[in-house]
């Protein structure tokens, strides 16, 4: 279903409670650089404030960050570099973004851990899902870096896989636009935004907000996705409060199912 207009989202309704207990937030690396190479401190600070506000409400949060503001393996390989090697360069870029976000969160008093799929003990813990869950249960934000630690897999796929393994209830896919459109709204003024999409419709239409592997993984395991505009302050809170912003990708009628957040056996 499409509504044709983005519109500005209102502030979260006063007195409401979050509808999700544990979420995974996917951030594109390009957003960290504000369209440029490197990290824009103002943007990262804004993201950190939004995350801190949600964590203060008791929501358990994990984050996956891309590295497109530094390197993009698939693009480097087109220029003649070995694909696997260029993907590893991209993974290192994601870790730089993780450390930047960690720094801004810690400055706000939010206890944070970075876990990476490639061992780098001086700056991060190794990725251990049970440990990540324990951190979140203690109110810490866990930031996952270095993708899946293997070439040929995107950070979108990483987000889907990590969300499933840590028992998240939803993937919050943050973008620079307010949802999924039938064409690029930056070049087509008549582009129509979808309120809800089924996984199979996303794949059939070849909509490019995430790669097919990530969408298939979410579809096969019933993991809902909310695609929303991160650049509007407060939208992360609106998403976890269940407000209808952006585009919901799920099966059924557009209401994300409440997946059960899980904890490891004690």
Swiss-Prot record:
Residues at which UMP binds: 67, 87, 148-155
GTP-binding listed as a keyword: no
Biological process annotations from GO: 'de novo' CTP biosynthetic process; UDP biosynthetic process
InterPro entries: AceGlu_kinase-like_sf (IPR036393), Asp/Glu/Uridylate_kinase (IPR001048), Uridylate_kinase (IPR011817), Uridylate_kinase_bac (IPR015963)
Reactions catalysed: UMP + ATP = UDP + ADP
Binding-site residues for ATP, renumbered to this chain: 26-29, 68, 72, 181, 184
The UniProt record lists the keyword Protein biosynthesis: no
Pfam families reported in the protein's UniProt record: AA_kinase (PF00696)
GO molecular function: ATP binding; UMP kinase activity
Pathway: Pyrimidine metabolism; CTP biosynthesis via de novo pathway; UDP from UMP (UMPK route): step 1/1
GO CC, alphabetical: cytoplasm
Activity control summary: Inhibited by UTP.
SUPFAM superfamilies: Carbamate kinase-like
Keyword field: ATP-binding, Cytoplasm, Kinase, Nucleotide-binding, Pyrimidine biosynthesis, Transferase
Compartments reported by the entry: Cytoplasm
Enzyme nomenclature, EC number: 2.7.4.22
Enzyme class per UniProt: transferase
Role noted for this protein: Catalyzes the reversible phosphorylation of UMP to UDP.
Self-association state and partner proteins as the record states: Homohexamer.
NCBIfam families: pyrH_bact
Family that this chain belongs to: Belongs to the UMP kinase family.
Name the UniProt record assigns to this protein: Uridylate kinase
């Amino acid at each position: 279903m499409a509504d044709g207009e983005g519109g500005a989202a209102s502030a979260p309704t006063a007195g409401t409670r979050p509808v999700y207990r544990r979420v995974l937030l996917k951030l594109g690396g390009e957003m960290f650089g504000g369209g440029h190479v490197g990290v824009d401190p103002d943007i990262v600070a804004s993201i950190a404030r939004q995350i801190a506000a949600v964590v203060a409400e008791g929501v358990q949060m994990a984050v996956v960050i891309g590295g497109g503001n530094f390197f993009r393996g698939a693009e480097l390989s087109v220029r003649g570099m070995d694909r696997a090697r260029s993907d590893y360069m991209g993974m290192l870029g994601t870790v730089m973004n993780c450390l930047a976000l960690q720094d801004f969160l810690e400055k706000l008093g939010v206890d944070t851990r970075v876990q990476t799929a490639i061992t780098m003990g001086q700056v991060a813990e190794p990725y251990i899902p049970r440990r990540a869950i324990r951190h979140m249960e203690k109110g810490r934000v866990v930031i996952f870096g270095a993708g899946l630690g293997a070439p040929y897999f995107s950070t979108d796929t990483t987000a889907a896989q990590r969300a499933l393994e840590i028992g998240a209830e939803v993937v919050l896919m943050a973008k620079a636009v307010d949802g999924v459109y039938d064409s690029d709204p930056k070049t087509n003024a008549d582009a129509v935004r979808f309120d809800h999409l089924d996984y199979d419709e996303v794949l059939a239409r070849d909509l490019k907000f995430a790669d097919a592997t990530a969408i298939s993984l979410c579809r096969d395991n019933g993991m809902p996705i909310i695609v929303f505009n991160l650049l509007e302050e407060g939208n992360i809170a609106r998403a976890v409060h269940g407000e209808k912003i952006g585009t919901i990708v799920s099966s059924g009628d557009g209401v994300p199912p409440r997946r059960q957040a899980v904890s490891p056996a004690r």
